[in-house]
Amino acid sequence: MAETTGRIPLWLIGTVTGIPVIGLVGIFFYGSYSGLGSSL
C-alpha cells in the first residue's frame, strides 16, 4: 500500500473515489426530492 501511495498522487485517489460517492449521494437526494426515494 505504501508503494502504490508513493507512485499514485493522493489527490488522484481522492478524485477517483470522490466522484462516484458524490454522484450516488446526488442521485439519492434527487430521488428522495422527486418522491421516488420513498418508494425505493
UniProtKB/Swiss-Prot annotation:
It comes from the Eukaryota. The keyword Transmembrane applies. Keywords: Chloroplast, Membrane, Photosynthesis, Photosystem II, Plastid, Reaction center, Thylakoid, Transmembrane, Transmembrane helix. It is found in: Plastid, Chloroplast thylakoid membrane. One of its GO terms (biological process) is photosynthesis. One of its GO terms (cellular component) is photosystem II reaction center. It is a single-pass membrane protein. The chain crosses the membrane at residues 8-28. It holds the Pfam family PsbJ. NCBIfam families: PRK02565.1 (NF002722). Belongs to the PsbJ family. PSII is composed of 1 copy each of membrane proteins PsbA, PsbB, PsbC, PsbD, PsbE, PsbF, PsbH, PsbI, PsbJ, PsbK, PsbL, PsbM, PsbT, PsbX, PsbY, PsbZ, Psb30/Ycf12, at least 3 peripheral proteins of the oxygen-evolving complex and a large number of cofactors. It forms dimeric complexes. One of the components of the core complex of photosystem II (PSII). PSII is a light-driven water:plastoquinone oxidoreductase that uses light energy to abstract electrons from H(2)O, generating O(2) and a proton gradient subsequently used for ATP formation. It consists of a core antenna complex that captures photons, and an electron transfer chain that converts photonic excitation into a charge separation. This is Photosystem II reaction center protein J. It comes from Cucumis sativus (Cucumber).
